Curated annotation (Swiss-Prot):
The keyword Oxidoreductase does not apply. This is SUN domain-containing protein 3. Pfam families: Sad1_UNC. As a probable component of the LINC (LInker of Nucleoskeleton and Cytoskeleton) complex, involved in the connection between the nuclear lamina and the cytoskeleton. The nucleocytoplasmic interactions established by the LINC complex play an important role in the transmission of mechanical forces across the nuclear envelope and in nuclear movement and positioning. May be involved in nuclear remodeling during sperm head formation in spermatogenesis. A probable SUN3:SYNE1 LINC complex may tether spermatid nuclei to posterior cytoskeletal structures such as the manchette. Residues 65-357 are perinuclear space. It comes from Homo sapiens.
Length: 357
């Protein structure tokens, strides 16, 4: 039975009791006037009874109304329940997201660890170079002390040939220290946002024998990805190798530019584990790509990397363009004699960015 029905029945019961009480009261009043001398006491009794019944009626109606309100409160409680479920669902999702974060942080930690390892190896390489330079300078000083000529007065006389030799040595040292300073922005730098488009890039060279030999050291690991050429760390073995002497790669630059020059870098024979750099690229060409790396190829120039020159060689583009390009394609036609693979260490692209940059 619903709360409303109970309330209506209670109200009808109250009206009937009131009518009966009124009728009885009227009859008693007449009786008290005509026949009953003790009418005041009876009237007070009926008043007590009526007050009690009225109080009980109000209590009953209030109880029924309270029950009805509780029944009508169910939809609101349902909405509250749904809100609680949604809140706990949101908390569960956030908790799961927090559980996933350590895995992502672990991957980031691995990358940072690899970068630290690469930097450490590069520091060791630079320390070796510094030791070599110190040895050269020490030999130069010893040579200066031991190769003075003396005149009849006992004063030292400098040998012109020896002075020229020392000057050449100093110039060589200064040249080696300056040769990596291109002093132009590199828009093919991975850390700046550049990337390799795999669909436009040759397959990497795979050599299980090389993997076993260099495992744990990192030299010429066939797992080296193509985007290694977009990173500044250059030391023996950290290169992208592709089969044979011909290959290509498509580079998405960090931003749109009007390209003006490119730079290719390789290690020198002095630091090569094999003692030669026959896997270095030789002839190569550069193209600009329009329309989001899928449009027409614009020829920018063809060049030769000289293995006997400096390790870092910059080439001015032979054909100027007037439109801003986002992608550059590098085609390599030959190497310096290696029969199995070509190894590319670093490739840079220079130019003028858009005015909005």
């Amino acid at each position: 039975m619903s709360g409303k029905t109970k309330a209506r029945r209670a109200a009808m019961f109250f009206r009937r009791c009131s009518e009966d009480a009124s009728g009885s009261a009227s009859g008693n009043a007449l009786l008290s006037e005509d026949e009953n001398p003790d009418a005041n006491g009876v009237t007070r009794s009926w008043k007590i009874i009526l007050s009690t019944m009225l109080t009980l009626t109000f209590l009953l109606v209030g109880l029924l109304n309270h029950q009805w309100l509780k029944e009508t409160d169910v939809p609101q409680k349902s909405r509250q329940l749904y809100a609680i479920i949604a809140e706990y669902g949101s908390r569960l999702y956030k908790y799961q997201a927090r559980l996933r974060m350590p895995k992502e942080q672990l991957e980031l930690l691995k990358k940072e660890s690899q970068n630290l390892e690469n930097n450490f190896r590069q520091i060791l390489f630079l320390i070796e170079q510094i030791d070599v330079l110190k040895a050269l300078l020490r030999d130069m000083k010893d040579g200066m002390d031991n190769n003075h000529n003396w005149n009849t007065h006992g004063d030292p006389v400098e040998d012109p040939d020896h002075t020229e030799e020392v000057s050449n040595l100093v110039n060589y040292v200064l040249k080696k220290l300056r040769e990596d300073q291109v002093e132009m922005a590199d828009y093919a730098l991975k850390s700046a946002g550049a990337s390799i488009i795999e669909a436009g890039t040759s397959e990497s060279y795979k050599n299980n024998k090389a993997k076993l030999y260099w495992h744990g050291i990192g030299f010429l690991n066939h797992e080296m990805p193509p985007d290694i050429i977009l990173q500044p760390d250059v030391y023996p073995g950290k290169c992208w190798a592709f089969p044979g002497s011909q290959g290509h790669t498509l580079i998405k630059l960090a931003t749109k530019i009007i390209p003006t020059a490119v730079t290719m870098e390789h290690i020198s024979e002095k630091v090569s584990p094999s003692g030669n750099i026959s896997s270095a690229p030789k002839e190569f060409s550069v193209y600009g790509i329009t329309k989001k790396c899928e449009g027409e190829e614009i020829f920018l120039g063809q060049f030769i990397y000289n293995k006997t020159g400096t390790t870092v060689q910059t080439f001015e583009l032979q054909h100027a363009v007037s439109e801003y390009l986002l992608c550059v394609k590098l085609n390599i036609f030959s190497n310096w004699g290696h029969p199995k693979y070509t190894c590319l260490y670093r490739f840079r692209v220079h130019g003028t960015p858009g005015k909005h940059i």
